[in-house]
A protein has these predicted regions:
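Catalytic cores of DNA base-excision repair glycosylases
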Residues: 1-132
Length: 132
């Protein structure tokens, strides 16, 4: 029910305040009901082609495993850390590649396929999985 209410309220605001257009401003997106950092970044990057870093579960898992962040599960903190090391124009594509890699190779529910991983030589977690 909450999601449906958020969608309805969001559509009403987009119609009344933005004349049926999605705002191109990150902070304006965050003010919309049901829109958080992940959705706002996804819209900024995929819809408007602007710099964005989408920290979903795959991105967070891989950033921890390869050592881009240290045992951090907070999406906002992972996003902040990535902004420091990823060129803005590369952020959106980088995150999409992490999602693809996380689904196909560096999986969460099964043992990752480290032997097929293009990041194996720099991955901190590889040794842990090799010992299992």
């Amino acid at each position: 029910k909450s999601k449906a209410r958020d969608i309805s309220a969001c559509m009403r605001i987009l119609h009344e305040q933005y004349h049926d257009k999605v705002p191109e401003d990150f902070n304006a997106l965050l003010k919309l009901p049901g829109v958080g950092r992940k959705s706002a970044n996804l819209i900024m990057g995929d819809v408007f082609g602007k710099p964005a870093i989408v920290t979903d579960t795959h991105c967070i898992r891989l950033c921890n495993r390869i050592g881009l962040v240290d045992n951090c599960k907070d999406p906002a903190k992972v996003e902040k850390a990535l902004w420091k090391i990823i060129p803005p124009e590369e952020g959106n594509g980088f995150c999409h590649r992490l999602v693809d890699h996380g689904r196909a190779v560096c999986t969460a529910r099964t043992k990752p396929y480290c032997d097929k991983c293009c990041l194996a030589d720099i991955c901190r977690a590889r040794k842990e999985f090799a010992n299992e």
